[in-house]
A protein has these predicted regions:
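Alpha-helical adaptor scaffolds
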Residues: 25-77, 83
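TPR-repeat structural position
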Residues: 14, 48-51, 86, 103, ...
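C-terminal single-pass membrane-anchor helix
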Residues: 118-148
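Juxtamembrane amphipathic/hinge helix adjacent to a transmembrane helix
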Residues: 88-121
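Alpha-solenoid helical repeat scaffolds
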Residues: 36-39, 70-75, 91, 105-110, ...
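N-terminal pre-first-transmembrane soluble regions of secretory-pathway and organelle membrane proteins
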Residues: 1-29, 77, 99
Length: 148
């Protein structure tokens, strides 16, 4: 699962699908396939702004093209995980599992998202604890200086 989350799009591939997407847009109608291919590339970009654009395109497809919802949910879960938006990623993974409850790949993704949420939670607790210790140390130093 880590390989999928760490998979980055090659610049040439992104440029090719971006060109195709923009050409169809210019002509007035972007096909579902073209929009999906471009969104898939964008979600695999190394840049957060590209990933967010890819997610917007996938969300649009999710609304307009019900036949592909399962795939769109999966790649939205991937995109949100890559952006460290774990609660959104979890929602999409769980929605996918409502459609296909035994999909091992998405079950593994859901577990990974859960682990990352736990890690981020622990980091938050560690930062808060560190801040409390710093403030406590400053107050202790201040009180010690006042007593002198």
């Amino acid at each position: 699962m880590e390989e999928i989350l760490n998979d980055s799009v090659v610049t040439d591939e992104l440029e090719r699908f971006e060109k195709k997407y923009n050409q169809e847009r210019k002509e007035g109608a972007v096909s579902t396939t073209t929009q999906f291919e471009y969104a898939y590339c964008m979600v695999r970009s190394d840049f957060a702004s590209d990933m967010k654009t890819g997610l917007v395109l996938l969300e649009d497809l999710f609304v307009r093209h019900p036949e592909g919802r399962r795939d769109y949910l999966y790649y939205m879960a991937i995109g949100h995980t890559r952006l460290k938006e774990y609660s959104e990623a979890m929602k999409h993974a769980q929605a996918f599992l409502e459609i296909e409850p035994n999909n091992q790949q998405v079950i593994a993704l859901e577990e990974l998202i859960g682990k990352r949420m736990d890690i981020e939670g622990m980091k938050g607790v560690a930062k808060a604890t560190g801040a409390v210790l710093v403030v406590g140390g400053i107050l202790g130093l201040g009180l010690a200086l006042l007593k002198k």
